[in-house]
């Protein structure tokens, strides 16, 4: 049971992060296409957003390990 819970935790967190990263990058590319002069600011905001989104799979892996080794 713990193995299935760990797999679900990792899978769903990776799925959510992938969708989130795709949306962030697509909106950034769209913004740069509309206003090329704002590229630097948009890119820095994008990297901050991607960093926050990538925290989700890390937390998912930690929860999976806690479930496996409990």
UniProtKB/Swiss-Prot annotation:
Record SUPFAM superfamilies: F1F0 ATP synthase subunit C
Keywords linked to the UniProt accession: ATP synthesis, Cell membrane, CF(0), Hydrogen ion transport, Ion transport, Lipid-binding, Membrane, Transmembrane, Transmembrane helix, Transport
Main location: membrane
Superkingdom per UniProt: Bacteria
Residues carrying the site annotation Reversibly protonated during proton transport: 54
Residues passing through the membrane, by range: 4-24, 45-65
Pfam families: ATP-synt_C (PF00137)
Subcellular location, record wording: Cell membrane
Family: Belongs to the ATPase C chain family.
Role summary: F(1)F(0) ATP synthase produces ATP from ADP in the presence of a proton or sodium gradient. F-type ATPases consist of two structural domains, F(1) containing the extramembraneous catalytic core and F(0) containing the membrane proton channel, linked together by a central stalk and a peripheral stalk. During catalysis, ATP synthesis in the catalytic domain of F(1) is coupled via a rotary mechanism of the central stalk subunits to proton translocation. Key component of the F(0) channel; it plays a direct role in translocation across the membrane. A homomeric c-ring of between 10-14 subunits forms the central stalk rotor element with the F(1) delta and epsilon subunits.
Assembly and interaction partners: F-type ATPases have 2 components, F(1) - the catalytic core - and F(0) - the membrane proton channel. F(1) has five subunits: alpha(3), beta(3), gamma(1), delta(1), epsilon(1). F(0) has three main subunits: a(1), b(2) and c(10-14). The alpha and beta chains form an alternating ring which encloses part of the gamma chain. F(1) is attached to F(0) by a central stalk formed by the gamma and epsilon chains, while a peripheral stalk is formed by the delta and b chains.
Protein name: ATP synthase subunit c
Organism: Staphylococcus haemolyticus (strain JCSC1435)
The organism's taxonomic lineage, starting at the top: Bacteria, Bacillati, Bacillota, Bacilli, Bacillales
